[in-house]
Each structure stands twice: as C-alpha cells, then as structure tokens.
C-alpha cells in the first residue's frame, strides 16, 4: 500500500497517465491532484506495483455509494501501469489485490476506463477477472 512518502512518485505516474489519453481532457490542477492522491492514501486504498524500488503502476480508489443507495462499493479513481510494464503481471496483481480488499470489506468493486483508448482489450481484461461491463460514458469533445 502507498504511504504519504509515495505522493510525489504517484503524481509523476498519474501525470504520465494523463498525457496518454486519446481524447482531449481537462488540464491537471496540481493542487487538486495532490489532494486526491492524499485523500485516497488516507481514506481509501492505493496500491503500488514496483520493480527495483520504482513505481511502475498503481490503482487507487475510495469507498462510496450510488446516489440512490447506502450500500458501499469500492471504486477506482485511477488504474495505470507504465507502458514498459504492461506485459508483466503488474496490472493483474493490482486489480486482484484491489478486488480482494473490497471483498474483505464486504464491498463490491466498480472499475472503469475512460479516455485511455484500447477499450476492447481493457474490457476483456476486466471480464477475465469476473467483472461485468455496465454501460458507457459519453462526453463532448472540443
């Protein structure tokens, strides 16, 4: 699990994720991103994949509920693995660990992928882990 010591490295990782988007997205507000990372570390779940003491991937999220229910679920804020580590087991280990933490807390998992492209491959990846696709997201593009 990530600790406050990891905030700077996570910022750099998530900035790389942001730069890989296939659609136009809003620019990063550094203070807001640092605040979100800290919130996830202190009140949620932030897991790291490391190779030789270097972070190569992360998944982070919070417990929340749907607007119509009190039932809690564990939802990701981000899930990203560096391109050079995508053929490793980093992604599957991160997601399986995230699911396990949610299950141990009696929460269902909600994961998404938006803006990053390669949608079919990612849908299949999540499907192999027992997750079911639940819709789509539509947005205006500038």
Identify the residue ranges that each predicted region occupies.
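Conserved beta-strand in the GNAT
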Residues: 48, 54-64
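A conserved beta-turn-beta hairpin within the catalytic core of GNAT-like acetyltransferases
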Residues: 65-76, 134
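Conserved acetyl-CoA-binding loop-helix of GNAT-fold acetyltransferases
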Residues: 87-100
